[in-house]
């Protein structure tokens, strides 16, 4: 019987991250998922993943802290002896216009979104290099490409992820490790569900497909780049945005 592959997904307990985790579970991957403090939905998730006949390891990890990321990877390797796929999805927003933004809110977003991506990737790459194989998919955003008023911290973090990904793709290609970005547009999640209907309508008007994306559509794109069928794409940014950026 073929050994199951292992995917480590940060921010994988809710929203887009949860959809990504489910996609990998459906395809028989064992999972490593981090959580920060909220354990309320972990039992529910455990039950949900049971039907896929896989193992899931939940590890409390603040991705902005390098030592915690190192420990998460160490525990994952002890459990599964490998990590085939890394999806850096953990992210937060602290939106405000530049004139009102506090240095603390700028730093928090950079620390989770960009530094967190560095921390987890740096912790995992030595194991992938030893195996001479691996897939890394980092979740950026269309605002990392285009910018967005009121989100200079978030846009900077997501633009940084693109530069980071292209750089590591060049460094790791000789070891058969592929690194790519998925850049979602407006996606229908808990974060967007609080928006008023008027705001949603104005957002949809900017999108050629006239609707927000679904988390599952992001998950499908991530799985394509991280799955076995991708053997020749690296250092790329896949915009999944309903045609916003062309």
Identify the role of each PLM range.
Residues 126, 170-174, 231:
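Alpha-helical segment proximal to the catalytic Tyr-Lys
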Residues 27-44:
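Conserved glycine-rich Rossmann-like NAD(P)H-binding loop of the short-chain dehydrogenase/reductase
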Residues 13-15:
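Conserved glycine-rich cofactor-binding loop
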Residues 141:
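Residue(s) in the substrate-gating loop at a strand-loop-helix junction
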Residues 121, 157, 165:
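Active-site helix of classical SDR
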Residues 118, 133, 177, 211-240, ...:
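C-terminal substrate-recognition "lid" of short-chain dehydrogenase/reductases
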Residues 97-98, 105-110, 203:
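Substrate-binding pocket helix/loop in short-chain dehydrogenase/reductase
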């Amino acid at each position: 019987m073929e050994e199951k592959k292992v995917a480590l997904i940060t921010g994988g307990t809710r929203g887009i991250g949860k959809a990504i985790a489910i996609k990998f579970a459906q395809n028989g991957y064992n999972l490593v998922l981090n959580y920060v403090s909220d354990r309320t939905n972990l039992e529910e998730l455990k039950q949900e993943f049971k039907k896929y006949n896989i193992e899931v390891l939940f590890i409390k990890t603040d991705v902005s802290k390098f030592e915690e990321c190192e420990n998460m990877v160490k525990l994952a390797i002890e459990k599964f002896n490998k990590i085939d796929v890394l999806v850096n999805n953990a992210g937060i927003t602290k939106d405000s216009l530049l004139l009102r933004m506090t240095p603390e809110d700028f730093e928090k977003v950079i620390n989770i979104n960009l530094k967190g991506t560095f921390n987890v990737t740096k912790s995992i790459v030595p194991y992938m290099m030893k195996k001479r194989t691996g897939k890394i998919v980092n979740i950026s955003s269309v605002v990392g490409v285009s910018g967005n008023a009121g989100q200079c911290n978030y846009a900077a973090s997501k633009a940084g992820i693109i530069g980071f990904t292209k750089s590591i793709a060049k460094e790791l290609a000789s070891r058969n490790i592929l690194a790519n970005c998925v850049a979602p547009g407006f996606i229908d999640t808990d974060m967007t569900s609080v928006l008023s209907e008027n705001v949603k309508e104005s957002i949809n008007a900017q999108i050629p497909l006239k609707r927000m994306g679904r988390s599952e559509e992001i998950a499908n794109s991530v799985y394509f780049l991280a799955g076995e069928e991708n053997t020749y794409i690296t250092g790329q940014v896949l915009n999944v945005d309903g045609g916003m950026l062309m």
